[in-house]
Amino acid sequence: MIDTIGMTDIGNGRPSNQDAYLLRQKEKNGKLYLLAVVCDGMGGLKKGEIASHYIVEVLKQWFDETLFDGLETMGIDMIEQNLIDLIRRINQNLLLMSRRMEETKSMGSTLTLLFVEEHEFFVLNVGDSRTYWFDRNRKFVTTDHTLAELELRAGHLTKEQATKDPRR
């Protein structure tokens, strides 16, 4: 097993904690499987905590109840595609939920996810919650999905301008 730990902090001046995380691991057929998820409700939007907790609950259910059915026939690429499809369905469900209730009209959350199968892994992300690879140098594994990042990649902003841009 891999030692994991998680915690959240409401931060300064926030009325609610919109963060949620998930750490799950299991051994099956001599292989270790780990799912680590961080969701950050979008602070400028109402009820981000509903979105972030919903994402975590669906992914927890997937890991605990669905992943290990038929696992013998799946490689890590198929698991990754299954998760991408699930994240798309989660997004569609969040959009439907947000349209049904006034209080959740503009809810949203970022997502960064690490999945490990023994000696292989992949990372998925939505939004600007980052995943880093730490060795002697800190490296980004993910790219922010923000307008400022798009402008930076297109050459319309410098790195310094992008860090100060309100669209980051």
Language model regions located:
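PP2C/PPM-type serine/threonine phosphatase catalytic domain
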Residues: 1-168
